């Protein structure tokens, strides 16, 4: 059974790449009102390997300390 972070990644990762890019995160946020620039800044801040996407480790590094989810 996947962890909460793995389940989140799988639900947002529409192209099955194992990563989340700006467009996928924007789509997941739906009508949140966040603009693309803000979402890209968030990804850039947490994108430790600088590939323009968030992978499972990068998501865990952000989400686990922030919300305690596994």
Curated annotation (Swiss-Prot):
<dbReference type="GO" id="GO:0005509">
    <property type="term" value="F:calcium ion binding"/>
</dbReference>
<dbReference type="Pfam" id="PF13499">
    <property type="entry name" value="EF-hand_7"/>
</dbReference>
<dbReference type="InterPro" id="IPR018247">
    <property type="entry name" value="EF_Hand_1_Ca_BS"/>
</dbReference>
<feature type="binding site">
    <location>
        <position position="17"/>
    </location>
    <ligand>
        <name>Ca(2+) 1</name>
    </ligand>
</feature>
<feature type="binding site">
    <location>
        <position position="53"/>
    </location>
    <ligand>
        <name>Ca(2+) 2</name>
    </ligand>
</feature>
<keyword id="KW-0106">Calcium</keyword>
<protein>
    <recommendedName>
        <fullName>Calcium-binding protein 2</fullName>
    </recommendedName>
</protein>
<feature type="binding site">
    <location>
        <position position="51"/>
    </location>
    <ligand>
        <name>Ca(2+) 2</name>
    </ligand>
</feature>
<feature type="binding site">
    <location>
        <position position="19"/>
    </location>
    <ligand>
        <name>Ca(2+) 1</name>
    </ligand>
</feature>
<keyword id="KW-0479">Metal-binding</keyword>
<dbReference type="InterPro" id="IPR002048">
    <property type="entry name" value="EF_hand_dom"/>
</dbReference>
<feature type="binding site">
    <location>
        <position position="49"/>
    </location>
    <ligand>
        <name>Ca(2+) 2</name>
    </ligand>
</feature>
<feature type="binding site">
    <location>
        <position position="47"/>
    </location>
    <ligand>
        <name>Ca(2+) 2</name>
    </ligand>
</feature>
<feature type="domain" description="EF-hand 1">
    <location>
        <begin position="1"/>
        <end position="33"/>
    </location>
</feature>
<feature type="binding site">
    <location>
        <position position="58"/>
    </location>
    <ligand>
        <name>Ca(2+) 2</name>
    </ligand>
</feature>
<feature type="domain" description="EF-hand 2">
    <location>
        <begin position="34"/>
        <end position="69"/>
    </location>
</feature>
<feature type="binding site">
    <location>
        <position position="15"/>
    </location>
    <ligand>
        <name>Ca(2+) 1</name>
    </ligand>
</feature>
<feature type="binding site">
    <location>
        <position position="13"/>
    </location>
    <ligand>
        <name>Ca(2+) 1</name>
    </ligand>
</feature>
<keyword id="KW-0677">Repeat</keyword>
<dbReference type="InterPro" id="IPR011992">
    <property type="entry name" value="EF-hand-dom_pair"/>
</dbReference>
<feature type="binding site">
    <location>
        <position position="24"/>
    </location>
    <ligand>
        <name>Ca(2+) 1</name>
    </ligand>
</feature>
